[in-house]
Design a protein with these regions (language model features):
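Thiol-based oxidoreductase modules, predominantly thioredoxin-like and allied folds used
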Residues: 37-49
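Non-catalytic, surface beta->alpha helical segment in thiol-disulfide oxidoreductase systems
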Residues: 66-94
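Compositionally biased, disordered extreme N-termini, encompassing classical targeting presequences
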Residues: 1-9, 36, 90-94
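Short polybasic/polar patches that bind polyanions
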Residues: 33, 54
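Local sequence-structure signature of Cys/Sec-based thiol-disulfide redox active-site neighborhoods
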Residues: 2-31
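Structural micro-motif
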Residues: 56-65
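Generic recognition of short, well-ordered alpha-helical segments
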Residues: 22-26, 51, 76
Length: 94
């Protein structure tokens, strides 16, 4: 379909008792209402979470990956993520 956005695969690395992780979940929930995203949450303490964090250079939670590439860690900027999702939408429309 013309103009349809391709879903972005989002992986959120979290840990227990992490207020920044809760903030990131809220940001992703808001943006998921506007953009096609598939969100997977991984515990940073899991073997898969540790491996992904090491691969992506994630120093502390929350870590965010977009389509397998590291996007951010620490406090997630809604503005920065929105700009990136807009950019990806524009590139799929060309």
């Amino acid at each position: 379909m013309t103009g349809q956005m391709v879903a972005v695969e989002v992986v959120l690395l979290t840990q227990n008792h992490c207020s920044l992780c809760e903030h990131a979940k809220q940001v992703l929930d808001r943006l998921a209402a506007e953009y096609p995203v598939r969100i997977t949450t991984l515990d940073l303490a899991s073997s898969e979470g540790r491996a992904l964090a090491a691969h992506g250079g994630i120093l502390f939670p929350p870590g965010v990956f977009l389509d397998g590439e590291p996007f951010s860690y620490g406090r997630l900027s809604e503005r920065k993520l929105r700009r990136e999702l807009d950019r990806r939408h524009q590139s799929t429309r060309r």
